[in-house]
UniProtKB/Swiss-Prot annotation:
It is an enzyme of class 4 (lyase). This is 3-isopropylmalate dehydratase large subunit. Binds 1 [4Fe-4S] cluster per subunit. Its EC number is 4.2.1.33. One of its GO terms (molecular function) is 3-isopropylmalate dehydratase activity. It comes from Neisseria gonorrhoeae (strain ATCC 700825 / FA 1090).
Length: 469
């Protein structure tokens, strides 16, 4: 039998029907639903007189539009409130396996909520009307974002039409150095292969450094796969995966658990499996990363300097650097560790889990917010993450440092709620995108790890965390 990649196994086990042009009908196991991309889909079902094909495939929460402060005042923005209220009504009418509404204890960012509830399991196909659905591939699942029309198709038929991507292996061999996190690995890889490097591919991450990551680290890595242009990112199942899933609310139990684990252990690429493309990196080459421009590929080690466009021979790239420097208000040759910040945001579906908050708290403990830093927002990814952080006293560490301890939600990752940057404000952010205006009109975003963000908060500028006691 031909050796198969993990992607081959996941894809082949979900093909319902093949068309002659390479298009297939692909079965979907889990559909994650939030308030932004679902209203039109639910309306389409109503107009056609349809119901959900499988109510027990749907897990839903409100996240993009929900405020992270002053919950006693409710949702002030009328459009945001309408979207959240509409989700409430649609779930009440159509049903779901689980729904975590605004202010519910389990509410949170959909890509944090799903895994912590055990709604994401190895071997599943997972879709959501959100580009960072690739996060769930960390479980040995095939996960990717879909558009609103596909959201409706999934609701009505439990299938989508798709063409198989090419396969790519990205391996990080060796051990990561102290102070280097999954976020740094992700940014480093994007810096090496570019934001189009994974276009047309489903990426499997492997190698010793990847296997050493926790599930939360793997989720960070797979979350960023889309920023390298990939359709999806995934990590093979191992004991780390199984241990994380065990005991989660929607995980199998008893005999069903034993059977599931037996199957899950097969969700690895076979020995001798051939990938369409491979990249291999030495983990020891990876340092703490900071983006300097308006694309995740515009990234350097913390010890680097803002590049000089005059040194770029490619006219298209040179023009891109010039535009980025103008927007970001930076001068060529400026050391990254001398760039001051105005705002710090620690949160998003990339870095708002309990381990991320622990990393940030370890840096913040015993320090105070720097005088030039206007605000530091700490936004847990879910109500359960917030509860755990408070049990550990992390909230007290942040508050004593002068940081804001917020309620769960997408927050400042994107300018779709009350948390946003003002023009020209410079932000050290643990989110996943640094495009122009992503965090607010004219806002300047630098992507970093939670520890690096916390270091910037207390020093007032980007700082190599390895130099801090």
């Amino acid at each position: 039998m031909t050796a198969q990649t993990l992607y081959d196994k996941l894809w082949n086990s979900h093909v319902v029907r093949e068309e002659g042009d390479g298009t297939v009908l692909l079965y979907i196991d889990r559909h994650l639903v939030h308030e932004v991309t679902s209203p039109q889909a639910f309306e389409g079902l109503k107009m056609a007189g349809r119901k959900l094909w499988r109510i027990d495939s749907v897990v839903s929460t409100a996240d993009h539009n929900t405020p992270t402060g002053d919950w006693d005042k409710g949702i002030q923005d009328p459009i945001s409130k309408l979207q959240v209220d509409t989700l409430d009504q649609n779930i009440k009418e159509f049903g779901a396996l689980a729904y975590f509404p605004f202010m519910d204890k389990g509410q949170g960012i959909v890509h944090v909520m799903g895994p912590e509830q055990g709604a994401t399991l190895p071997g599943m196909t997972v879709v959501c009307g959100d580009s960072h659905t690739s996060t769930h591939g960390a479980f040995g699942a095939l996960a990717h974002g879909i558009g609103t029309s596909e959201v409706e198709h999934t609701m009505a038929t439990q299938c989508i039409t798709a063409k198989k991507s090419k396969s790519m292996l990205i391996a990080a061999d060796g051990k990561l150095k102290a102070g280097v996190t999954a976020k740094d690995v992700a940014l480093y890889i994007i810096g090496q292969i570019g934001t189009a490097g994974g276009t047309g591919y489903a990426v499997e991450f492997g190698g010793e450094a990847i296997r050493s990551l926790s599930m939360e680290g793997r989720m960070t890595l797979c979350n960023m796969a889309i920023e390298a242009g990939a359709r999806s990112g995934m990590v093979a199942v191992d004991q780390t995966t199984i241990d994380y899933v065990k005991g989660k609310p929607f995980a199998p139990e008893g005999e069903a658990w034993d059977k599931a684990v037996e199957y899950w252990r097969t969700l690895v690429s076979d020995e001798g499996a051939v990938f369409d493309k491979e990249y291999r990196f030495n983990a020891e080459d990876i340092e703490p990363q900071v983006t300097w421009g308006t694309s995740p590929e515009m990234v350097l080690n913390i010890g680097g300097k803002v590049p000089n466009p005059a040194e770029e021979t490619d006219p298209v790239k040179r023009s891109g650097i010039e535009r980025a420097l103008e927007y970001m208000g930076l001068k060529a040759g400026t050391p990254l560790n001398e760039i001051p910040v105005d705002i710090v945001f620690i949160g998003s579906c990339t870095n708002s889990r309990i381990e991320d908050l622990r990393e940030a708290a370890a840096i913040a403990k015993g320090h105070k917010k720097a005088g030039n830093v206007q605000r530091v927002l700490i936004v847990p990814g879910s109500g359960l993450v917030k509860e755990q952080a408070e049990k550990e006293g992390l909230d007290k560490i942040f508050i004593e440092a002068g940081f804001e301890w917020r309620e769960p939600g997408c927050s400042m990752c994107l300018a779709m709620n009350a948390d946003r940057l003002a023009p020209r404000q410079r932000c050290a952010s643990t989110s996943n995108r640094n495009f122009e205006g992503r965090q607010g009109n004219g806002g300047r975003t630098h992507l970093v790890s939670p520890a690096m963000a916390a270091a910037a908060a207390v020093t007032g500028h980007f700082t190599d965390i390895r130099t801090m006691a």
